[in-house]
Amino acid sequence: MKIRELFSGFEEYGWETPSEEIAAKVGLPVEEIVRLDTNTSPFRPVRALEDLASALDTIEVNQYPDTSYLSLREDLAGYTGKGLDRFVITNGADEGLDIITKVFLDPGDEVVITAPTYSMYRIASSIMGARVVTVPRRKDFSIDVEKILASVTPKTKAIFLCNPNNPTGDFTPIADLERLAEESRVAVAIDEAYFEFCGKSAVDLSDELENVIVCRTLSKAFSMAGVRIGYLVAKPETVKKLNVVRPPNSVSVISLFLAQAALAHPDEMRGNVRSTVEEREKLVRRLGEIRGIVVYPSETNFLLFRVLDGDASAVHGELMGKGLVLRNLSRVQGVENCLRCTVSTPEINDRLVAALERALAHGSER
Protein backbone atom coordinates (compact mmCIF):
# COMPACT_ATOMS: atom_id res chain seq x y z
CA MET A 1 0.00 0.00 0.00
CA LYS A 2 1.60 3.23 -1.15
CA ILE A 3 1.44 6.38 0.96
CA ARG A 4 2.08 9.96 -0.11
CA GLU A 5 5.70 10.41 -1.12
CA LEU A 6 5.86 13.43 1.18
CA PHE A 7 5.45 11.15 4.21
CA SER A 8 8.18 8.69 3.28
CA GLY A 9 10.69 10.43 5.55
CA PHE A 10 8.29 11.19 8.39
CA GLU A 11 8.55 9.59 11.82
CA GLU A 12 5.65 8.95 14.17
CA TYR A 13 5.04 11.79 16.62
CA GLY A 14 6.71 11.14 19.98
CA TRP A 15 3.64 10.74 22.18
CA GLU A 16 4.07 10.68 25.94
CA THR A 17 4.73 7.22 27.34
CA PRO A 18 1.58 5.93 29.12
CA SER A 19 1.72 6.04 32.91
CA GLU A 20 0.97 2.30 33.05
CA GLU A 21 4.07 1.57 30.96
CA ILE A 22 6.23 3.84 33.11
CA ALA A 23 4.90 2.23 36.30
CA ALA A 24 5.74 -1.24 35.01
CA LYS A 25 9.22 -0.10 33.99
CA VAL A 26 10.15 1.46 37.35
CA GLY A 27 8.25 -1.04 39.52
CA LEU A 28 5.77 1.36 41.11
CA PRO A 29 1.97 1.32 41.32
CA VAL A 30 0.50 3.46 38.57
CA GLU A 31 -1.16 5.62 41.23
CA GLU A 32 2.30 6.79 42.31
CA ILE A 33 3.25 8.09 38.86
CA VAL A 34 3.05 11.90 38.72
CA ARG A 35 2.99 13.48 35.26
CA LEU A 36 5.04 16.67 35.31
CA ASP A 37 5.83 16.39 31.60
CA THR A 38 2.58 17.56 29.96
CA ASN A 39 2.00 21.04 31.43
CA THR A 40 -1.52 20.07 32.47
CA SER A 41 -3.31 21.37 35.54
CA PRO A 42 -3.14 19.51 38.86
CA PHE A 43 -6.66 20.79 39.58
CA ARG A 44 -9.93 19.27 38.41
CA PRO A 45 -12.58 21.64 37.00
CA VAL A 46 -14.84 20.85 39.93
CA ARG A 47 -17.78 23.15 39.23
CA ALA A 48 -17.93 22.27 35.53
CA LEU A 49 -17.98 18.56 36.41
CA GLU A 50 -20.74 19.17 38.95
CA ASP A 51 -22.76 20.99 36.29
CA LEU A 52 -22.21 18.08 33.90
CA ALA A 53 -23.37 15.52 36.47
CA SER A 54 -26.55 17.52 37.05
CA ALA A 55 -27.28 17.90 33.34
CA LEU A 56 -26.35 14.49 31.93
CA ASP A 57 -29.96 13.44 31.46
CA THR A 58 -30.66 16.51 29.32
CA ILE A 59 -27.65 16.42 26.98
CA GLU A 60 -28.67 15.02 23.60
CA VAL A 61 -25.69 12.79 22.88
CA ASN A 62 -27.78 11.07 20.19
CA GLN A 63 -27.73 14.29 18.13
CA TYR A 64 -24.94 16.14 16.34
CA PRO A 65 -23.83 19.40 17.93
CA ASP A 66 -24.76 22.77 16.46
CA THR A 67 -22.02 22.99 13.84
CA SER A 68 -21.70 26.75 14.29
CA TYR A 69 -21.01 26.27 18.02
CA LEU A 70 -23.02 29.43 18.61
CA SER A 71 -23.53 29.03 22.36
CA LEU A 72 -19.84 28.51 23.01
CA ARG A 73 -18.93 31.45 20.79
CA GLU A 74 -21.32 33.59 22.83
CA ASP A 75 -19.56 32.57 26.03
CA LEU A 76 -16.14 33.19 24.50
CA ALA A 77 -17.32 36.62 23.41
CA GLY A 78 -18.09 37.36 27.04
CA TYR A 79 -14.72 35.99 28.18
CA THR A 80 -12.61 37.83 25.60
CA GLY A 81 -14.67 40.91 24.78
CA LYS A 82 -14.60 40.04 21.06
CA GLY A 83 -17.55 39.66 18.68
CA LEU A 84 -19.28 36.39 17.79
CA ASP A 85 -17.82 36.50 14.29
CA ARG A 86 -14.27 36.49 15.63
CA PHE A 87 -14.03 32.82 16.69
CA VAL A 88 -13.29 29.43 15.17
CA ILE A 89 -14.00 26.59 17.62
CA THR A 90 -11.60 23.65 17.38
CA ASN A 91 -10.97 20.22 18.85
CA GLY A 92 -8.02 21.39 20.93
CA ALA A 93 -5.49 24.00 19.87
CA ASP A 94 -3.68 21.52 17.62
CA GLU A 95 -6.68 21.33 15.31
CA GLY A 96 -6.57 25.13 15.14
CA LEU A 97 -2.93 25.00 14.05
CA ASP A 98 -3.84 22.34 11.49
CA ILE A 99 -6.62 24.54 10.08
CA ILE A 100 -4.21 27.47 9.71
CA THR A 101 -1.72 25.39 7.73
CA LYS A 102 -4.47 24.02 5.47
CA VAL A 103 -5.75 27.51 4.66
CA PHE A 104 -2.44 29.26 4.02
CA LEU A 105 0.10 26.66 2.84
CA ASP A 106 0.70 25.08 -0.54
CA PRO A 107 3.47 22.54 -1.21
CA GLY A 108 6.75 24.42 -1.60
CA ASP A 109 5.69 27.40 0.51
CA GLU A 110 7.82 28.48 3.44
CA VAL A 111 6.96 28.84 7.13
CA VAL A 112 9.11 30.63 9.70
CA ILE A 113 9.34 29.35 13.27
CA THR A 114 11.75 29.96 16.13
CA ALA A 115 13.75 27.36 18.02
CA PRO A 116 13.27 25.97 20.52
CA THR A 117 9.48 26.03 20.42
CA TYR A 118 6.39 23.82 20.23
CA SER A 119 6.99 21.03 17.73
CA MET A 120 3.50 20.94 16.17
CA TYR A 121 4.19 24.06 14.08
CA ARG A 122 6.88 22.15 12.22
CA ILE A 123 4.84 18.96 11.99
CA ALA A 124 1.60 20.56 10.74
CA SER A 125 3.46 22.70 8.20
CA SER A 126 5.55 19.81 6.92
CA ILE A 127 2.44 17.69 6.41
CA MET A 128 1.22 20.38 4.00
CA GLY A 129 4.48 20.12 2.07
CA ALA A 130 5.87 23.43 3.27
CA ARG A 131 9.53 24.13 3.95
CA VAL A 132 10.11 25.11 7.58
CA VAL A 133 12.68 27.87 8.14
CA THR A 134 13.99 27.94 11.70
CA VAL A 135 15.34 31.09 13.37
CA PRO A 136 17.22 30.33 16.62
CA ARG A 137 16.23 32.24 19.72
CA ARG A 138 18.84 34.22 21.61
CA LYS A 139 20.65 32.77 24.63
CA ASP A 140 18.02 34.31 26.91
CA PHE A 141 15.36 32.69 24.66
CA SER A 142 14.03 36.02 23.38
CA ILE A 143 13.19 36.21 19.68
CA ASP A 144 15.32 38.12 17.18
CA VAL A 145 12.77 40.19 15.25
CA GLU A 146 15.33 41.35 12.70
CA LYS A 147 16.42 37.80 11.88
CA ILE A 148 12.83 36.61 11.61
CA LEU A 149 11.96 39.40 9.19
CA ALA A 150 15.16 38.73 7.24
CA SER A 151 14.03 35.10 6.86
CA VAL A 152 10.77 36.11 5.17
CA THR A 153 10.90 35.61 1.39
CA PRO A 154 8.29 35.78 -1.38
CA LYS A 155 7.65 32.09 -0.64
CA THR A 156 6.87 32.70 3.05
CA LYS A 157 3.19 32.29 3.87
CA ALA A 158 3.15 32.08 7.67
CA ILE A 159 5.04 32.74 10.89
CA PHE A 160 4.26 30.66 13.99
CA LEU A 161 5.09 31.99 17.46
CA CYS A 162 4.26 30.60 20.89
CA ASN A 163 3.72 33.31 23.51
CA PRO A 164 4.58 32.61 26.27
CA ASN A 165 6.88 30.12 24.61
CA ASN A 166 6.96 26.39 25.19
CA PRO A 167 9.39 24.99 26.37
CA THR A 168 11.28 28.08 27.54
CA GLY A 169 8.52 29.97 29.39
CA ASP A 170 9.53 33.46 28.20
CA PHE A 171 7.18 36.16 26.90
CA THR A 172 7.66 38.15 23.70
CA PRO A 173 6.60 41.83 23.95
CA ILE A 174 3.39 42.61 22.07
CA ALA A 175 5.17 45.40 20.19
CA ASP A 176 7.54 42.83 18.64
CA LEU A 177 4.61 40.69 17.49
CA GLU A 178 2.87 43.73 16.04
CA ARG A 179 5.99 44.67 14.10
CA LEU A 180 6.33 41.14 12.72
CA ALA A 181 2.72 41.16 11.54
CA GLU A 182 2.89 44.62 10.00
CA GLU A 183 6.23 44.20 8.23
CA SER A 184 6.04 40.55 7.17
CA ARG A 185 2.53 40.85 5.70
CA VAL A 186 2.10 37.06 5.99
CA ALA A 187 -0.16 35.08 8.32
CA VAL A 188 1.16 35.40 11.88
CA ALA A 189 -0.20 32.68 14.16
CA ILE A 190 0.30 33.46 17.85
CA ASP A 191 -0.19 30.46 20.13
CA GLU A 192 -1.41 31.68 23.53
CA ALA A 193 -1.92 28.32 25.24
CA TYR A 194 -0.40 29.71 28.45
CA PHE A 195 -1.51 33.36 28.36
CA GLU A 196 -3.72 33.15 31.46
CA PHE A 197 -0.61 32.50 33.56
CA CYS A 198 0.98 35.81 32.57
CA GLY A 199 -2.12 37.97 32.00
CA LYS A 200 -0.77 39.45 28.76
CA SER A 201 -2.20 38.81 25.31
CA ALA A 202 -1.79 39.82 21.68
CA VAL A 203 -5.46 39.20 20.95
CA ASP A 204 -6.18 42.92 20.43
CA LEU A 205 -3.79 42.91 17.46
CA SER A 206 -6.37 40.79 15.65
CA ASP A 207 -8.87 43.66 15.88
CA GLU A 208 -7.05 45.60 13.16
CA LEU A 209 -4.54 43.25 11.54
CA GLU A 210 -6.12 40.77 9.15
CA ASN A 211 -3.03 38.54 9.16
CA VAL A 212 -2.96 37.97 12.95
CA ILE A 213 -4.54 34.75 14.21
CA VAL A 214 -4.47 34.00 17.93
CA CYS A 215 -4.71 30.34 18.94
CA ARG A 216 -5.95 29.44 22.42
CA THR A 217 -6.99 26.43 24.47
CA LEU A 218 -8.97 25.48 27.56
CA SER A 219 -6.46 22.70 28.30
CA LYS A 220 -4.13 24.57 30.63
CA ALA A 221 -5.66 27.29 32.83
CA PHE A 222 -9.18 25.81 32.63
CA SER A 223 -7.96 22.29 33.59
CA MET A 224 -9.54 20.67 30.52
CA ALA A 225 -6.73 18.99 28.59
CA GLY A 226 -8.81 15.83 28.25
CA VAL A 227 -11.86 17.70 26.96
CA ARG A 228 -10.07 18.98 23.83
CA ILE A 229 -11.39 22.50 23.30
CA GLY A 230 -9.46 25.22 21.50
CA TYR A 231 -10.36 28.35 19.61
CA LEU A 232 -8.91 30.77 17.10
CA VAL A 233 -9.46 34.53 17.26
CA ALA A 234 -9.10 36.66 14.13
CA LYS A 235 -10.80 39.35 12.09
CA PRO A 236 -14.19 38.27 10.64
CA GLU A 237 -12.86 38.05 7.08
CA THR A 238 -10.03 35.79 8.27
CA VAL A 239 -12.45 33.66 10.28
CA LYS A 240 -14.47 33.05 7.11
CA LYS A 241 -11.34 31.71 5.39
CA LEU A 242 -10.52 29.45 8.34
CA ASN A 243 -14.06 28.08 8.53
CA VAL A 244 -13.77 26.81 4.96
CA VAL A 245 -11.64 23.88 6.16
CA ARG A 246 -12.97 23.51 9.71
CA PRO A 247 -14.49 20.06 10.27
CA PRO A 248 -18.23 20.51 10.96
CA ASN A 249 -18.60 18.19 13.98
CA SER A 250 -15.15 17.72 15.50
CA VAL A 251 -16.21 18.91 18.98
CA SER A 252 -18.57 16.66 20.96
CA VAL A 253 -21.67 17.83 22.80
CA ILE A 254 -20.08 16.73 26.09
CA SER A 255 -16.96 18.80 25.38
CA LEU A 256 -19.09 21.78 24.40
CA PHE A 257 -21.08 21.52 27.63
CA LEU A 258 -17.95 21.31 29.77
CA ALA A 259 -16.35 24.25 27.97
CA GLN A 260 -19.39 26.42 28.57
CA ALA A 261 -19.61 25.27 32.18
CA ALA A 262 -15.96 26.19 32.75
CA LEU A 263 -16.47 29.63 31.21
CA ALA A 264 -19.48 30.10 33.49
CA HIS A 265 -17.19 29.73 36.52
CA PRO A 266 -14.16 31.89 35.67
CA ASP A 267 -13.40 32.54 39.34
CA GLU A 268 -12.49 28.88 39.81
CA MET A 269 -10.01 29.09 36.93
CA ARG A 270 -8.55 32.37 38.19
CA GLY A 271 -8.11 30.93 41.67
CA ASN A 272 -6.27 27.92 40.27
CA VAL A 273 -4.08 30.18 38.14
CA ARG A 274 -3.21 32.33 41.17
CA SER A 275 -2.25 29.22 43.12
CA THR A 276 -0.12 27.97 40.25
CA VAL A 277 1.68 31.29 39.83
CA GLU A 278 2.37 31.46 43.57
CA GLU A 279 3.76 27.93 43.52
CA ARG A 280 5.77 28.71 40.39
CA GLU A 281 7.56 31.59 42.09
CA LYS A 282 8.25 29.46 45.17
CA LEU A 283 9.57 26.66 42.99
CA VAL A 284 11.82 29.04 41.05
CA ARG A 285 13.42 30.15 44.31
CA ARG A 286 13.77 26.64 45.70
CA LEU A 287 15.20 25.13 42.53
CA GLY A 288 17.51 28.12 42.25
CA GLU A 289 19.03 27.15 45.60
CA ILE A 290 20.01 23.70 44.35
CA ARG A 291 23.63 23.44 43.24
CA GLY A 292 24.23 22.05 39.78
CA ILE A 293 21.24 23.48 37.92
CA VAL A 294 20.16 26.83 36.52
CA VAL A 295 16.44 27.67 36.44
CA TYR A 296 15.02 29.99 33.78
CA PRO A 297 12.32 32.61 34.44
CA SER A 298 8.83 31.57 33.38
CA GLU A 299 5.48 33.22 32.72
CA THR A 300 3.69 29.89 32.34
CA ASN A 301 2.71 26.89 34.47
CA PHE A 302 6.03 25.12 33.88
CA LEU A 303 9.74 25.66 34.51
CA LEU A 304 12.77 24.89 32.38
CA PHE A 305 16.07 24.13 34.06
CA ARG A 306 19.49 23.11 32.81
CA VAL A 307 21.66 20.51 34.50
CA LEU A 308 25.16 21.99 34.78
CA ASP A 309 26.95 19.11 36.43
CA GLY A 310 26.13 15.74 34.93
CA ASP A 311 23.73 14.31 32.40
CA ALA A 312 20.14 15.56 32.32
CA SER A 313 18.97 12.22 30.94
CA ALA A 314 20.42 10.44 33.96
CA VAL A 315 18.66 12.89 36.29
CA HIS A 316 15.45 12.38 34.31
CA GLY A 317 15.75 8.62 34.73
CA GLU A 318 16.40 8.83 38.45
CA LEU A 319 13.39 11.09 38.98
CA MET A 320 11.25 8.73 36.93
CA GLY A 321 12.34 5.92 39.22
CA LYS A 322 10.76 7.92 42.04
CA GLY A 323 7.53 8.27 40.07
CA LEU A 324 8.17 11.85 38.89
CA VAL A 325 7.97 12.16 35.11
CA LEU A 326 9.54 15.31 33.63
CA ARG A 327 10.02 16.24 29.98
CA ASN A 328 13.52 15.37 28.83
CA LEU A 329 14.73 18.05 26.41
CA SER A 330 18.41 17.23 26.72
CA ARG A 331 18.84 16.59 22.99
CA VAL A 332 16.69 19.47 21.72
CA GLN A 333 18.63 22.24 20.00
CA GLY A 334 18.82 25.35 22.16
CA VAL A 335 17.86 23.59 25.40
CA GLU A 336 20.58 20.96 25.53
CA ASN A 337 20.85 19.13 28.86
CA CYS A 338 17.58 20.71 30.02
CA LEU A 339 14.50 19.30 31.72
CA ARG A 340 11.03 20.84 31.91
CA CYS A 341 8.66 20.36 34.82
CA THR A 342 5.02 21.31 35.29
CA VAL A 343 4.26 23.40 38.37
CA SER A 344 2.01 21.27 40.56
CA THR A 345 0.59 21.30 44.09
CA PRO A 346 2.75 22.21 47.11
CA GLU A 347 3.00 18.54 48.08
CA ILE A 348 4.15 17.40 44.64
CA ASN A 349 6.52 20.35 44.31
CA ASP A 350 8.08 19.45 47.68
CA ARG A 351 8.51 15.89 46.47
CA LEU A 352 10.14 17.13 43.26
CA VAL A 353 12.63 19.38 45.04
CA ALA A 354 13.68 16.63 47.44
CA ALA A 355 14.06 14.06 44.65
CA LEU A 356 16.01 16.48 42.47
CA GLU A 357 18.40 17.31 45.31
CA ARG A 358 19.06 13.59 45.83
CA ALA A 359 19.48 12.94 42.11
CA LEU A 360 22.02 15.73 41.70
CA ALA A 361 23.88 14.63 44.83
CA HIS A 362 24.11 11.11 43.42
CA GLY A 363 25.35 12.52 40.13
CA SER A 364 28.16 14.42 41.83
CA GLU A 365 29.26 11.19 43.53
CA ARG A 366 29.58 9.27 40.26
Which residues are covered by each model-predicted region?
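N-terminal small-domain helix-loop-helix segment of the aminotransferase-like
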Residues: 1-92, 99
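Short beta-strand
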Residues: 35, 294-298, 330-331
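Short, conserved charged micro-motifs
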Residues: 47-48, 310-317, 348-351
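Conserved core of the PLP fold type I
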Residues: 60-183, 194-209, 213
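PLP-dependent aminotransferase class I/II
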Residues: 211-289, 293-296
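Conserved PLP-binding catalytic core of the aspartate aminotransferase-like
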Residues: 277, 290-322
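PLP-dependent enzyme catalytic core of the Aspartate aminotransferase-like
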Residues: 321-322, 331-366
